[in-house]
């Protein structure tokens, strides 16, 4: 089964062509990535594939769902870690995870269980009470990835999750 399929996916910003007619077929279970220099359109493609922005033209199907007809249905089934992260700086790590679960309507018991699982799985137990404002960039990235696992998703998109990390922090994040 294909989890992502595009046909002639194109994005223009005014007269500037950012993405030029991409055709993709990505199978379920496949790990896939984009390589290219700064400004090549990698982040734009991810925003198109995650329905965070509409294409100028072309077709997109994610998990069998037509993006033109049901972009919100797609958003409910995917996780997205963007290059420019968003944080609630005043929340502790565990409260940030819990709040994200609340946003996805995860019941309280499940949120508590998942928070504990994710704190352990992502090596966040020792910093669970720290506020996001007090975390290193690497710790913030781990929290950002962990919070996507608070809801049931079928597909995870990562847009440069290791940007700004030193080599040891990069390896640590990728090991999760």
Where are these regions (language model features)?
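Helix-to-loop junction immediately C-terminal to a conserved catalytic motif
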Residues: 50
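Conserved ABC transporter NBD signature motif
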Residues: 58-66, 73-74
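Conserved ABC ATPase "signature" region
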Residues: 98, 102, 109-127
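Conserved ABC ATPase signature
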Residues: 131-135
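Hydrophobic anchor residue at the start of the ABC signature
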Residues: 145
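Catalytic Walker B motif of ABC-type/P-loop ATPase nucleotide-binding domains
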Residues: 156-159
């Amino acid at each position: 089964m294909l989890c992502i399929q595009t046909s002639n996916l194109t994005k223009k910003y005014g007269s500037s062509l950012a993405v030029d007619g991409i055709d993709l077929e990505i199978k379920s279970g496949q790990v896939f990535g984009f390589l290219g220099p700064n400004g090549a359109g990698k982040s734009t493609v991810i925003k198109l594939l995650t329905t965070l922005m509409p294409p100028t033209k072309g077709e997109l199907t994610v998990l069998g769902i037509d993006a033109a007809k049901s972009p919100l249905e797609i958003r409910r089934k995917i996780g997205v870690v963007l290059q420019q992260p968003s944080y609630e700086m005043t929340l502790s790590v565990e409260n940030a995870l819990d709040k994200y679960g609340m946003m996805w309507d995860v019941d309280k018991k499940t949120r508590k269980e998942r928070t504990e699982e994710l704190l352990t799985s992502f090596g966040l137990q020792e910093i669970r009470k720290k506020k996001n404002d007090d975390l290193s960039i690497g710790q913030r990235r781990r929290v950002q990835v962990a919070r996507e696992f608070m809801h049931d998703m079928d597909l995870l998109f990562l847009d440069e999750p290791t940007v700004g990390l030193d080599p040891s922090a990069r390896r640590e994040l990728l090991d999760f």
